[in-house]
């Protein structure tokens, strides 16, 4: 599905504001194509402002910003300003989060996530169109309504295209909707190459076909866990950390279908049970070598670049490696090989 495109290499921008600018500068200096923030314990947008200020080429994105914690007007505003300030380099990556977080952490409504996300993106684009072309804003949907936009609240038109919108998706319905309405897809680390090729890619292609769009206008991005080390001890430690991370993801109902695709569906209830008991060590012990290899790139440092390419080329367009418990020296060496 990735065709003959050059595989883009992306990196992470820390959400701590004091570190964001230096990290973005380092990514650009070292030849990375994009830098991404995540929404966890800090806001995902503020670091991108600093990154935009200190770089000129690096694509800048959120992976992800929680859409349902906000409304389309709020996201349209911050996306518009970041797109203008970065001179057209923003990728607005949106995700749904899960019901407990939306309702109990953000105190926002939940329901029909694929339909709601589709409408969220449509509302964003209606707002941006009103700002850019002066089109009357008259968006009324099932979940969102935006009908007032007076000159006082209308930002200036900009010389750049509206921000690209990527959607995080794992399930078929959300992935197909992503292919239909978004500019790109954000893949989760708990997605194997088999799941990508057998489930995600066909769903994306169905969505693209329904929208009548060409594949060349769409990007597929994926985070990939990497377990490596300078020696056997470091590699073993990285593998242990990666097994724990896979087990944590596998305990979450959202990723049960990924396990089922490999015939490992029975593992989910046990991981879920152990997670409720806080038995994290025991959970990691249930992830065997076959499972580890399905969800992560594993091996000595000098094998990582080739393994990443083998996993991603022809399937995805850009990769964000997530190194588990690796030294910075190992990370630098592996990524230097990748960029050659």
UniProtKB/Swiss-Prot annotation:
One of its GO terms (molecular function) is oxidoreductase activity, acting on paired donors, with incorporation or reduction of molecular oxygen. It holds the Pfam family Bac_luciferase. InterPro entries: F420-G6PD/mer, Lucif-like_OxRdtase_MSMEG_2256, Luciferase-like_dom, Luciferase-like_sf. Keywords: Signal. Residues 1-20 form the signal peptide. Was identified as a high-confidence drug target. This is Uncharacterized protein Rv1360. It comes from Mycobacterium tuberculosis (strain ATCC 25618 / H37Rv).
């Amino acid at each position: 599905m990735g065709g003959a495109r050059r595989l883009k290499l992306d990196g992470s921008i820390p959400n701590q504001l004091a570190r964001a600018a230096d990290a973005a500068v380092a990514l650009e200096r070292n030849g990375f194509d994009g830098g991404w923030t995540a929404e966890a314990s800090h806001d995902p947008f503020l670091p991108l402002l600093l990154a935009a200020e200190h770089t000129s080429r690096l694509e800048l994105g959120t992976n992800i910003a929680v859409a349902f914690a906000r409304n389309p007007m709020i996201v349209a505003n911050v996306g518009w300003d970041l797109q203008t300030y970065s001179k057209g380099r923003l990728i607005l990556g949106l995700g749904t989060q899960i019901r407990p977080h939306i309702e109990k952490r953000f105190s926002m409504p939940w329901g029909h996530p694929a339909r709601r996300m589709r409408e969220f993106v449509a509302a964003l684009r209606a707002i941006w169109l009103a700002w850019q072309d002066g089109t009357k804003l008259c968006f009324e949907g099932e979940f969102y309504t935006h009908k007032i936009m007076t000159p006082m609240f209308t930002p200036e038109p900009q010389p750049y295209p509206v921000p690209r919108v990527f959607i995080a998706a794992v399930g078929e319905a959300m992935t197909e909707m992503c292919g239909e309405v978004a500019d790109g897809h954000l893949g989760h680390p708990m997605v194997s190459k088999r799941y990508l090729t057998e489930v995600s890619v066909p769903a994306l292609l169905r969505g693209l076909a329904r929208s009548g769009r060409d594949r060349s206008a769409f990007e597929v991005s994926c985070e990939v866990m990497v377990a490596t080390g300078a020696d056997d001890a470091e590699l073993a430690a990285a593998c242990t950390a990666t097994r724990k991370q896979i087990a944590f993801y596998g305990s979450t109902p959202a990723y049960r279908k990924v396990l089922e695709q490999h015939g490992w569906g029975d593992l989910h209830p046990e991981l879920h049970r152990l997670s409720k008991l806080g038995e994290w060590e025991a959970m990691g012990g249930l992830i065997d070598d076959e499972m580890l290899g399905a969800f992560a790139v594993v091996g000595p440092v000098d094998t990582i670049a080739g393994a990443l390419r083998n996993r991603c080329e022809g399937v995805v367009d850009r990769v964000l490696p997530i190194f588990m418990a690796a030294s910075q020296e190992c990370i630098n060496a592996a990524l230097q090989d990748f960029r050659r």
